[in-house]
Amino acid sequence: MTKYEVTVYNAQVRKMVEAGEHHPQWDDEWAEFRYIDVTADNEDKARAQIESRYPPGQGFIIDNVAEHYEHQEDE
């Protein structure tokens, strides 16, 4: 399995924040990108995991899905 970093935001929240309002359900931080790590067999399955937790019908947008690489310290 591969670790992916998925970039997500909420379009409804972003629109309301830009208008100086607040979403009744989600906090204002959802207007900005959030980076969520998931482990999946492939990119499509990583996307499906995120969409099940953050449904597009509730305004969530997946901006990017990328393999997550661990940085190793130089010895």
List each language-model region with its residue ranges.
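A short, structured loop/turn motif at beta-sheet edges
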Residues: 1-4, 40-43
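A short beta-strand micro-motif
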Residues: 3-12
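Residues at beta-strand starts and edge strands
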Residues: 2-4, 32-34, 60
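A short, exposed loop/beta-hairpin motif centered on an aromatic-Gly-Thr core
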Residues: 26-41
